[in-house]
Regions:
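Two-component/phosphorelay signaling modules centered on CheY-like receiver
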Residues: 14-32, 121
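Active-site beta3 strand of CheY-like receiver
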Residues: 47-53
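Receiver (REC) domain active-site loop signature in two-component systems and cognate sites
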Residues: 58
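C-terminal output helix
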Residues: 109-118
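The C-terminal output helix
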Residues: 119-132
Length: 132
């Protein structure tokens, strides 16, 4: 890829943030990182990433609060958000989808596999719709 594609990783775990940043770079993404929900929302407004990978469980402002804030803001409402979670309960996932999550990825995950998933999903979102 000739140009880095901006994505945002919001996770309170520094090891996960840095690992995702390195993994995503292998697939042509430039990952901006935020260590908490508030800084993540602000960074999303500033950088306009093409994707957001959002941890569900964080202190102060959890992933669902961040998701709600992003989806109720004209500047960020159209950015696809993938929840990173170890919560596999159907009710939890339904709530995330109701708020506006586009997909979810369960922890633990393989970093290389995650990079491939994000690249594939990004290509799907950016492909022009077939007409007729």
């Amino acid at each position: 890829m000739s140009k880095w594609i901006p994505v945002l990783v919001i996770d309170d775990d520094e090891i996960i943030r840095e690992a995702l940043k390195r993994s995503l770079k292998l697939y042509g993404f430039e990952a901006y990182t935020a260590e908490n929900g508030l800084s993540g929302v602000n960074l999303a407004r500033q950088k306009k990433p093409v994707f957001i990978l959002l941890d569900w469980i964080m202190p102060e402002m959890d992933g669902l609060e961040v998701l709600s804030e992003l989806k109720h803001d004209k500047r960020t409402e159209d950015i696809p958000v993938f929840m990173l979670t170890d919560r596999g309960m159907i009710g939890d996932l339904d709530l995330a989808f109701e708020i506006g999550a586009d997909n979810y990825i369960t922890k633990p995950f393989d970093l290389m596999q995650l990079g491939k998933i994000v690249k594939t999903k990004w290509e799907k979102y950016t492909k022009p719709a077939k007409v007729g």
